Structure formats: structure tokens, C-alpha cells
Amino acid sequence: MSRPKNDTFLRALLKEPTEYTPLWLMRQAGRYLPEYCETRKRAGNFLNLCKSPTMACEVTLQPLARYDLDAAILFSDILTVPDAMGLGLYFAEGEGPKFERPLREEWAINNLTVTDPYEHLGYVMDAVSEIRRALDNSVPLIGFSGSPYTLACYMVEGEGSSDFRNIKAMLYNRPDLLHRILSVTADSVIAYLNAQIDSGAQAVMIFDTWGGSLSNAAYEEFSLQYMRRIVAGLKKEKDGQRIPSIVFTKNGGLWLEKIADIGCDAVGLDWTIDIGEARRRVGDKVALQGNLDPNVLFAQPEIVAAEAKKVLDSFGPANTGHVFNLGHGISQFTPPESVTALVEAVHSHSRLSRK
């Protein structure tokens, strides 16, 4: 299978020359877009939207119809994996995701098994295939999963948390139980991402949203080593084309060199680290993705453009190795016109800097 017509994103991840800096946004298909809100309304609820391949395809494509983005990302949710493992995902109105059966008991943890992505997550694979057909080889499609530790946070807490006291208590009191959860989840994520690749994903990303809440030693033991295992288990090629991998730990700047050493092709950065400093620290080992503060998009368009240029200038002179993104997901309250200003600024300024 040939590369997409616009393969700038893939080339940047593989540190091949590009004519400009490619750009996509975490949560680019989301509630800041009125068309997304309309589709979600038709779906009835968020889970219905995720589990309908046709609707997931529709919302995946919406930001690409509006903006000149360089990649599409599968519309789904990181919690589909623990849901497939039998924890009973549901969304309480106004309260976010919850699990009916959080993992607190030893017997339940010992009964966990690796999920078969085709048996339990077939709707995701159907969505990937449908999106690839709809994209018609225009831009690459990114598949994704949460990291084992981030998924375990929800699996043990049963919902989002401000202090993660249940999983932290397990980490210190019964690290063996947490390692059991992480091991089964890591193997499930490997199978899940490889199934996405087989279904058409052309790059994959691991979102480690909560790894940055760990202590230095705990991060390496309970988050990083499992992401290393996943990266090692990923399919590196499909139909003769390299499948790059991106790893993103929010608040992970402390461990940048260690993340770059696990075998991934690119490291995602949040907005708390200077991307130029990050580049100096990792050298040419990996590409970098990021890292504009998402809240910049609440500023005036000319400020958005100026802040985007600061990120590009900080990365420094190069014709490859940088994928522009936000430092975290785009806010649902973002004015859509701010994204227009951002895309135009990134593409135009990066083209000029290569002349």
C-alpha cells in the first residue's frame, strides 16, 4: 500500500525531510466543533458515538473538512480497552467515565485476562477500516491507546480522580497486584494497537495522561517499563510501510531522555517544557511532537499565530523531526476560528523558515 498523498506527518515522525512542519491536534474531533455536537446529539450518548463505526468515521473527518490538518486520528476513547476487559464502562451525565466493577479485590485482579480486540473491540477495527476508506489516501490515520498505568488509574479508582489514592495505596501496599493489572493491560494494548494497524492505522500513539503523577522511581517501574514493552511488541511495518509510534506522558519532561530510549519514533511533549531544550536533550534519537499550551487558543488570532511561531522557532532550524501539536487535548470551549489561525501560522511560518 502506498503512502498517503500528504505524507508530511509520517515523514516528520521518521525524521525524513519535509517542506513544512505538519500539524494535528489532540482531540481535534471534539466538542469545540458545532458539527461534532450535532453528530453526538444524533448518537444519543458518547458511548453510542464511539461504538458506531459510521458515526466515529463521520466525526473523525469533521476537523479535516474544516482545517488543513496533516493527519486524522481515530475517534474513540482510551477506556474501550478496560471496558472490553469486563469492567463495565458507563458515562454518568456531567460526571465523566465510570466503571461498574473497579478492580479492588485480589480475586478480580487475578481473573483479568488479555482481551481479544477482534472479539470485544471489533467496532473500533470497523471504524478504522471505514475511516481509511473515507480518507481515500489523503492524509495518514493515527490509531491510539491509553498507557497501561493511565488505564489502570481508571480501572482501580473506578472513575477520574484528583488524588488517585486507591491506585497509589495499591502501588505501595500490594505492588504485585498492580503489576498484574499492568501486565495484562499491556498485553491487551499490544493486541489492540496491532489490530488497529492491521485494520489500517498508519501510525499509533500511546497516551500516558497520568504517568506524570508518579514519583520518579514509580514512573519507571509502573509506567515506563510497560510502555517499553508495548513499543517492543508493536508491528513496525504494514504492506511495506513503516508504522511510527508516538509516546506522550503528560508532565513527563523529567523523564524525557528515558522515554526517548524505549524505542518509540517520537515523544509527545506537554507545554511545560521548552521544545528547544527538549530537542537538545534527546538529540536526533526521536522526533518531537508538540507543544503549544492549549489555552493559547483562547487568545486573539494574532496572538495564537505569534505563540505558534515561538514554538517553531524554539525547535530551531530543521526540515524534519517536528510534528506540531498542542501540549494536551484541545478544550471544548476553544473558538473554532483560533484553530484556523493556528494551522495557517504553523504551515506558513515553517515553510518560510525552510527557505
From Swiss-Prot:
Subcellular location: Cytoplasm
Top-level taxon in the UniProt lineage: Bacteria
Annotated catalysed reactions: uroporphyrinogen III + 4 H(+) = coproporphyrinogen III + 4 CO2
Alphabetized GO MF terms: uroporphyrinogen decarboxylase activity
EC numbers: 4.1.1.37
Annotated site (Transition state stabilizer): D77
Main localisation: cytoplasm
Gene Ontology biological-process annotations: protoporphyrinogen IX biosynthetic process from glutamate
Record keywords: Cytoplasm, Decarboxylase, Lyase, Porphyrin biosynthesis
One GO CC term on file: cytosol
Signal peptide positions on this chain: none
Protein name: Uroporphyrinogen decarboxylase
Chain's gene name: hemE
